[in-house]
Curated annotation (Swiss-Prot):
Superkingdom of source: Bacteria
Reaction catalysed by this enzyme: S-sulfanyl-L-cysteinyl-[protein] + uridine(34) in tRNA + AH2 + ATP = 2-thiouridine(34) in tRNA + L-cysteinyl-[protein] + A + AMP + diphosphate + H(+)
Start and end residues of each stretch annotated as Interaction with tRNA: 189-191, 344-345
Predominant subcellular localization, coarse grouping: cytoplasm
InterPro entries assigned to the protein according to its UniProt record, in alphabetical order: MnmA-like, MnmA-like_C, MnmA-like_central, MnmA-like_central_sf, Rossmann-like_a/b/a_fold
Name this polypeptide is given: tRNA-specific 2-thiouridylase MnmA
Binding of ATP, residues: G42, L43, S44, G45, G46, V47, D48, S49, L68, G154
Name of encoding gene: mnmA
GO biological process, one term: tRNA wobble position uridine thiolation
GO cellular component terms, A-Z: cytoplasm
GO molecular function, one term: ATP binding
């Protein structure tokens, strides 16, 4: 679906307002980008993607907005997001295109998410969604239908383009690839963790204008430009949870109740549950059992349909296995390498020794033929299978994969 003005509209960005210092720097860099200044912007209807489009327009780029239709119904990924994105495009005087991605989203995200929960994991769908549903499809569609070879999004991350590969200190035999993925400068908003699955081919064509802004500056810039989404609140939940009301409601829609046992780590029966999909490693609240001390989930057994709980002291581990690894900014290490590992979004990176191991057949078939063992320098609480483990050296995102287990 495409909504294109018959006659080119004039942007309603106020001309008299002066950009913030951060905004001025972004505009200067956007104006200085080499090559064709025509670009597609992924618009969700939120303030971040709205400002991304607005700054590009203000910097003189030829901008076209693209919104993915992921689900039917209300919510930021559904009708509400489409309406707000269309309104922003009207305000900026740019065309708005809607891609019906519901079938892809159902296949690549919903079905795999349900399967993961049934297997006792806690999947992290956002990284996979970025890879399979957002960046690649938008780039392909924009090039085929609009002749555009670049895309911008409102993610808080940065990309550094190098003329030639260079060495880095973490693994002297490894070369950094030409297009490095870096953390966003706003440490509280950095979203590089969710982008570890992007390829070099994608990074070459992507621009993240907000990567050097703080969230507060984004709000100020959006207010300066008088964007209609300037005060729109951020979504606090996974889009599926927001769409269904809660994650439990989403899972109940796709997975039938299946009663099982809740056991103490010594084998003592403590209670019953109605589905392993409602539990995650480290969980303490909502277990439905009473005990003399707080208990945490330490294991979810899909084969026996059992949930194992124990005191917090038993919920920490000093190692894990990671599979389906995508090496973003360096070539795959062939030897042991010291890396900083982020085990969940906004968690503090911890040091670990990464040892490459033999890949699984499924990883090879999915073009992710890399696995590793991580040995942490100290025990980590609630290492959760299904979540992403992302490797850094300082601000450089080296790569990442999916936690398989201990």
């Amino acid at each position: 679906m495409t909504i294109t003005p018959k006659n080119k509209r004039t942007s309603s960005i106020p001309k008299s307002q002066t950009a913030t210092i951060g905004g001025e720097e972004v505009l200067k860099k956007l104006k200085g980008v080499e090559g064709d200044h025509s670009i597609a912007v992924g618009l969700s209807g939120g303030v971040d993607s709205s400002l991304t489009a607005a700054l590009l327009v203000e910097a003189g780029w030829n901008v076209e907005g693209i919104t993915l239709w992921l689900m039917s119904g209300k919510g930021s990924c559904c009708t509400d997001g489409l309406v707000d994105a269309a309104g922003i495009c009207e305000q900026l005087g740019i065309p708005h295109h809607v891609i019906d991605a519901r079938e892809t989203f159902q296949r690549e995200i919903i079905e795999s998410l349900v399967k993961g929960y049934q297997e006792g994991m806690t999947p992290s769908p956002c990284s996979k969604c970025n890879r399979f549903v957002k960046f690649s499809p938008i780039l392909e569609w924009a090039e085929q239908n609009l002749g555009l070879k670049r895309i911008a999004t409102g993610h808080y991350a940065r990309i550094k383009h190098l003329q030639e590969p260079i060495k880095i200190s973490s693994a002297k035999e490894n070369q950094i690839r030409r297009h490095q993925l870096l953390r966003g400068l706003d440490q509280n908003k950095d979203q590089s963790y969710f982008l570890y699955d992007l390829s070099q081919e994608i990074l070459e064509k992507v621009i993240f204008p907000l990567g050097e802004l703080k969230k507060a500056d984004t709000r100020k810039e959006a207010s300066r430009i008088e964007l209609r989404t300037a005060e729109k609140p951020e979504s606090q939940d996974l889009c599926l949870a927001e769409h269904h009301g809660s994650m439990k409601a989403f899972l109940d829609e796709y997975i039938s109740p299946r009663n099982g046992e809740i056991l103490l780590s010594n084998g003592q029966l403590l209670g019953q549950h109605d589905g392993i999909e409602h539990f995650t490693i480290g969980q303490r609240k909502g277990l439905g059992i009473a005990w003399k001390e707080p208990l945490h989930v330490i294991e979810i057994q899909s084969s026996t349909n059992r949930v194992i709980v124990a005191p917090r002291s038993e919920a920490s581990r000093d190692n894990c296995t990671v599979g389906s690894i995508n090496w973003v900014s360096i070539e795959p290490p062939s030897k042991k390498t010291i890396v900083e590992v982020q085990l969940r979004y906004r968690s503090k990176p911890v040091l670990a020794t990464l040892t490459p191991i033999k890949p699984l057949k499924k990883d090879i078939e999915n073009d992710r033929p890399y696995r590793c063992n991580l040995q942490f320098q100290s025990e980590q609480f609630s290492i959760t299978p299904g979540q992403a483990a992302v490797f850094y050296e300082g601000e450089i995102l080296l790569g990442g994969g999916i936690i398989e287990g201990n």
